[in-house]
Amino acid sequence: MGHKFLNDAGAAVTEMLEGFVQSHPGVKFLDGFPDVKVVVRSHVDKNKVALVSGGGSGHEPAHAGFVGDGMLDAAVCGDVFASPSVAAVLAAIRHVTGSPGCLLIVKNYTGDRLNFGLAAERAKLEGLNVEMVVVADDCALPPPLGVAGRRGLAGTLFVHKCAGAAAAAGEPRSWELGVRAGREGAHSTSKCRHTRVAAASFITCGAGGLCASFVLCTMVD
């Protein structure tokens, strides 16, 4: 296991985000921090399509590290390996969304899809134009493996960048031009179909203060 400096495992995400915001002048916290862990751009442009992403913490620089020009307008951060709440996602949508609308970029995990999806539906009831794209790029879990199918991994970054560049250029339908995704069903949810990632690790992971979640086998002669 790698060594980490933690004052308190229970406050690790809050302290990490505080340090990040203090060292990056272009971002700030949304009102309600730390109960609502949302990092937004210091100056939000509501004349373009807004991009919002997020998920469980523990995979830095995701997601706050991708907030900035030509990228995300807001990152919604959950606890370690835990999805952010519906209330936090909805607060982010409300803060950054103008008349051009908002795109939620979500990785294919059950909690993320559920909470971002519920927040999107509530935002629509408030009259906001919200779309959601799901990134499922994991080569290790092709269908029918895995309960929820392919996970969303590092390929999500390319979706951030493609959609972010289109939004910054003023494209009115950045989710179509940046993501090249096809519509699925009647839930305003698209799936990014052309990104694949094979992930590997040299060490196991574990939430702060807990044992490793699994053991890597070692090769012997």
Regions found by a protein language model. Name each.
Residues 59, 68-99:
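Glycine-rich oxoanion-binding loops at beta->alpha junctions
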Residues 167-221:
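Mixed-charge interfacial surface used for oligomerization/domain docking
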Residues 2-3, 49-56, 72-75, 101-110, ...:
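Short glycine-rich or small-residue beta-strand-to-loop segments that form or flank ligand, phosphate
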